[in-house]
Every structure is written in C-alpha cells, then in structure tokens.
Amino acid sequence: METNQILETIRMIEEEKLDIRTITMGISLLDCMDGDGEVARKKIYQKIVTKARNLVAVGEAIESEFGIPIINKRISVTPIAIIAGSSADTDYVGFAKTLDAAAKEVGVNFIGGYSALVQKGYTKGDEILIRSIPQALAQTERVCSSVNVGSTRTGINMDAVRQMGEVIKETADLTADTQGLGCAKLVVFANAVEDNPFMAGAFHGVGEADCVINVGVSGPGVVKRAIEKVKGEPFDIVAETVKQTAFKITRMGQLVGQVASEKLGVPFGIVDLSLAPTPAIGDSVAHILEEMGLEMVGTHGTTAALALLNDAVKKGGVMACGHVGGLSGAFIPVSEDAGMIEAVQQGALNLEKLEAMTAICSVGLDMIAVPGDTTAETLAAMIADEAAIGVINNKTTAVRVIPASGTKVGDMVEFGGLLGTAPVMPVNGKSSVDFIARGGRIPAPIHSFKN
C-alpha cells in the first residue's frame, strides 16, 4: 500500500470522523419459544448472554488493533411478537425487561427486536405486543421497538397505522419526564428489512441464520471533504468522487465485519452502506448536500442532491463488499444532524420537504419532534404518507416521530448523546381524522404482481 493511502486513512479517521457506527449481532430466538412465558424468558436471556458475551470486548479489541473507532455494539433479535406469541401470556412487558437485562449484562447500548410484522394483519402475539409497546419502552432503557405496517407485496394495513399513531402518543406521555425519549426508540416501517444493523429499527429476520454479525458504516465528514475538492465541477465528477470515497468507507466496514466474525465464531452477514450522521460538527449529511451547491438543505434542489449522493454511495459500496444489505441509504435524522437542525431553525426545511426526501433515502421522517398536542390521527396520517411512498416505490421507508408532551413549535427537545437535539416542527393543522377512521387495507400497487 502506498504511503499516501495510509496517511489518507489516518486523516479520514482523525480529522473527518470516519467510524464504524455499529457492529450488530443478530440472534435468532426461534428455539426459545415455549408455552410458559417464564421459561421462554429464561431461554431468551440465556441465549443472548451466551452468544453476545464477548461482543463488546471483541469490538474494543478491533478498535485498538486497527485504530478504527467502533461507536456502538448492539444486538438484534427475532421479532418478539413471534416468540412471545407461543406463550399463554397476555402482556409482553416482561419480555422487554428480559431483553433489557440481557443487554445490560453483555454491555451493549441497544437491543432491537421488540417488534411485530403486521403488513397484512395481526396474530395474537402481534396484538399483545403492539398494545404493550408504550409500557415496554417506558420501563426499559436499552430496548428498541419497530412495527412493519406495509409492504409493496401486501399494501398498507391501515388498522395498524391507526393504532401506531395511538401507540406513539401514549409512549410520549409515558416517557414525558425524558421529553418523549421512548418515541426515539420506536420506528414504524414499510418494507422493513431483516438484516438492518441500525437502531431503532433493527430486528433479526426469520430467514436469517442462527447468529450473524452485521456492520453499519458511517462517514459523512469524509464524503463532504471529498466533495470540497471538486468545487464547481459537473455532477458526473461529483458522483464519481462520492463513489470512490464510499468504496474506501465500505472496505473498512467489510474488514471490521470479517475480523469480528472470525473472533466471535459467528458468520458475517452484511455491511449496511447508510451514511449516518451524528450531532458532532463535521459529521452531517446536510452539509454534504450544501457542499454540492445548496445554500441550505431544504431549498429547491435538495431532493436531487440527495438522489445523487445516495446512488453514488451504493455504487461505490457494492464494489467494495461481497454482501451489502440493511437499509443502505442516507439517513436524515433531524435531531442527529447539525446541518438539519440549523435548516429547521432557519425555516429552510419542513416536514413536507423531508417527506419528499423519503422517496430517496430509507428513513425520511426520522427523529422529528412535533408539538405535544399533535393528535394520534395526525401521527397516523404521517405514517400512512411515508408508508405509501415506500410501498409504491418498492423501498424501505419509516417514521420516527416524537410528539414531546408540553412542547410547542420552536421549542427544543434535548435527548443527549447520539440522539441529539430536535427543534419542534409545525404540522399541518387540518384534520385527517375521518381518513384514518376508515381502517382496513390499502391494496398493493399493480406493479407488485411480479410472479
């Protein structure tokens, strides 16, 4: 390897905040099912602790061996609605507490999979789990929850959409003392993927192996610095530059995933190519888009800039890694991106523009704070809009919205750490109550019939 490439890698890590955002161990709990909930919970705890006992230590060893920061070590499990559904329990909060205890025991910062897949309808387990989400998130620290309410193959389950509006509202109320932090750990999906390493939407799909390692990379600062070097050049050059940079970032993710896999004795799954920002200066997706020539993210041209970025990252990443997966799209979480926060505060970025950007990236309305008096029906209608974009365009879309109790437009909601700070954004004041009240299913689009 040439000296300048070594120096470039060091600079990417030290100055441009290149890191591995997460090493996530996916663990199947299908063999933990039991008619007795207490027995099932013991099996779950035992399996997670056994499989993930060395996860954090191995992550730290790789950090020191290669000098690559690994920000998070996490776990995803089989959707608990499936596992708990085989028991006679009528409340699943105990399962959430078991996951929380296991996460604390092995030292990971989040565990995902308190989830239900209801794109076409509910099972008994789905009903009980979704009902219990607010209490589960209020009574645990590290558990993340997700619900899939639609897919291109099946359409949108509007009964589930309506219920999720109510669940988000109740979760915000029950975690009001932390400004609705529970809602930051709850994602509503359309076309959810089974191998997502990123929280809060990670769960371990039933088609996955017993245990796998998935890696999520991150490097908005690196991409921005690369684009700075081609100022004023045509978009062809910009796309090529992003592609080459994404190749380097993904190569690092592949290396870390393979080494972790060998050290843990667990198969390597995928690298997720998503560019994930943090609130730190120099680690913003918004600033990449602005470097392309936008005065501020949210102005006209933002969606086109995001399209170029997203596509070029995928093209570069696919060449660098044998198995890519997860969400693999730019993340635009408002509270976790310094450039997004500033754009909202300046009035350049609103919910409608973020919804348009969802057509490009994976999680469009992400870490959005809305006024505390926003109704459950309005939240449900926001979910329906996002799900529709995903279902029609055959892609993953999601909503992570926080109706922080007692807040009004312009207030700031503080979460701290990687979750950052969210300015409370205005929502459309006109009602969607009668629309959401209809329930039923929005049929799958005509182009979903591929067989």
From Swiss-Prot:
SUPFAM superfamilies: PFL-like glycyl radical enzymes
Xref: InterPro entries: UPF0210
CDD domains, per the entry: RNR_PFL_like_DUF711
Lineage top rank: taxon: Bacteria
Pfam family, one: DUF711
Residue ranges that the Swiss-Prot or TrEMBL entry lists as coiled coil: none
Disulphide-bridged cysteine pairs: none
Subunit structure and binding partners: Homodimer.
Family under the similarity heading: Belongs to the UPF0210 family.
UniProt name for this protein: UPF0210 protein LMHCC_2097
